[in-house]
Every structure is written in C-alpha cells, then in structure tokens.
C-alpha cells in the first residue's frame, strides 16, 4: 500500500524545540505514525505535556530539559539515547528563535549576533555531529532541519536570524552530499505559522490582514502543515529525496517582493 511509505512504525526520532508549537506537533505526529520520540526543549512542564500525549498513543517518550546551545547537555542527551535505543532513525533540528540578534545593525552587537547564530545554526550542527554514530547505526537515517522563509526573504532587523537560517539551508545541502547514501538530509522553510510565538498576529485583526495579504493561500500556516512536511521527509515516502528545502509558506516564495509582508505588519504594530 502506498500509505505504508509514510509509516514510522518501529522508528525512533529525536526532536528539538519540542515543547510547543511546530516541534511539539512534529513529535506527536510522528508518534501517531508509530515512532518513539525523544523530546528536547527548555521547559520541563512543556515536555511533560507533549510526552503524555505520546505515551497515550502507546509510544515511548524521553524528555530532556536543556538549552540546545549547551554542548555538554546535548552530549548527555545523545549518551542517554545511545544507552536506551542504540540507534536513531530520525533527527529533527527544529529549535530556533531570533534570540538577542533581532534588531538593526546599529543595535546588534557581535555578542548578540553570535547568540542568534548559536541558537539557530551552531546548535543544529553540534547535535548532528554528536548524533551521527546513532544515525549511522540505523538502517537508513533521516535528518530534517527546520529553517525559515527568512533564510531567503529580505526583512529589516533579521540580519542575524536570516544569516543563521540561510546557513542552515546550505548546511543541509552539503551534509546531504556528504552523508549519502546512508543518511538523507533535507530541510523545511516555514513561512508565517500560527504558534504561541506568533499569536500576536492572529490577535490583531489589522496585523493579521496585512500579513495574509501577501500569502496566496490567504491564511497563516498551522503546525500541522509543517508536521506533514516533516513526516514526508522523515519517512520512506521521500526515500529518493535528499538535499532539498521544502518551502511551506502558502505560496509566498512564488511572489516578488515578499519582504513587504513582514514590514507592513510590523509597521502597523508600531503605529
């Protein structure tokens, strides 16, 4: 059956940024499709809530409350999973945030810039490096890096975040070449998605309308939209796909001048 290609039965996945929003939905979606899931996020209570959902589905869940910029903590995560599982089928590098690097060139110092790079790019590289032996121990590994439309879209105040996400996309392509054929590496570049961190858009009618005006599908994306793309890339359904970045943005990438979208919304918010 064609649906069998999407099954994750017997697979083991590690998802960062799994406490809320996109990461949480990826984790629970994978469990719905049969995977055991290890969850990484900063807040234990958030992790516990997601883990409860996964266990109610009859799947195994491990939780790790840590900062992804802490290499020692990531090393501990991998060591624990090595002992518990011995192999890893899927790695989802989803953790990310603008961090201290949001702002103009005048305001963002080198230290603040590096904070954003560490959160969004260095942490993903570090965890991928540490988890490589586990991924190689699986019959076929799959890495999915969640970047952002801001990796290609030009918008003021996002020099650090945009650089980090563009770097993640290029890292995805290079590692796809380097790790083939035993490990596939792909990426997802979300557009504007409804999550706790973007709730302010939906709560302001003018801002919402200004934002969706530049999205051909006429709405914000939902965590399910990203989880479905992640499921495709993590499963055997994409067995001949590697080195690709899937833009899940409601068609925004097809339009010229999409930098206007965020600028209008932000201008209206400050008026």
List the predicted regions and their residue ranges:
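Alpha-helical segment proximal to the catalytic Tyr-Lys
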Residues: 133, 176-181, 239
């Amino acid at each position: 059956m064609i649906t069998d290609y999407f099954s994750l039965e017997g697979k083991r996945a590690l998802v960062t940024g799994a406490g809320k929003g996109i990461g949480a939905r990826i984790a629970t979606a994978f469990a719905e499709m049969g995977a055991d899931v290890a969850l990484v996020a900063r807040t234990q209570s958030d992790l516990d809530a997601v883990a409860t959902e996964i266990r109610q589905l009859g799947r195994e869940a491990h939780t790790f409350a840590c900062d992804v910029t802490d290499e020692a903590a990531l090393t501990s995560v991998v060591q624990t999973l090595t002992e518990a599982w011995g192999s890893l089928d899927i790695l989802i590098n989803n953790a990310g945030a603008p961090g201290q690097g949001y702002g103009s060139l005048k305001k963002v110092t080198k230290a603040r810039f590096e904070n954003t790079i560490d959160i969004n790019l260095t942490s993903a590289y570090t965890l991928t490096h540490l988890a490589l032996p586990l991924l190689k121990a699986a019959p076929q590994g799959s890495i999915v890096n969640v970047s952002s439309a801001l990796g290609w879209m030009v918008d003021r105040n996002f020099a650090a975040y945009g650089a980090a996400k563009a770097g993640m996309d290029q890292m995805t392509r290079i590692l796809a070449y380097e790790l083939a054929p035993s490990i596939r590496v792909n990426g997802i570049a979300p557009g504007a998605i409804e999550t706790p961190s973007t709730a302010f858009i939906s709560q302001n009618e003018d801002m919402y309308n200004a934002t969706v005006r530049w999205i051909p599908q006429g709405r914000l994306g939902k965590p399910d939209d990203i989880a479905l793309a992640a499921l495709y890339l993590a499963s055997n359904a994409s067995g001949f796909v590697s080195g690709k970045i899937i833009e899940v943005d409601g068609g925004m990438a097809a339009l010229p001048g999409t930098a206007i979208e965020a600028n209008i919304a932000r201008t209206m918010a400050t008026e």
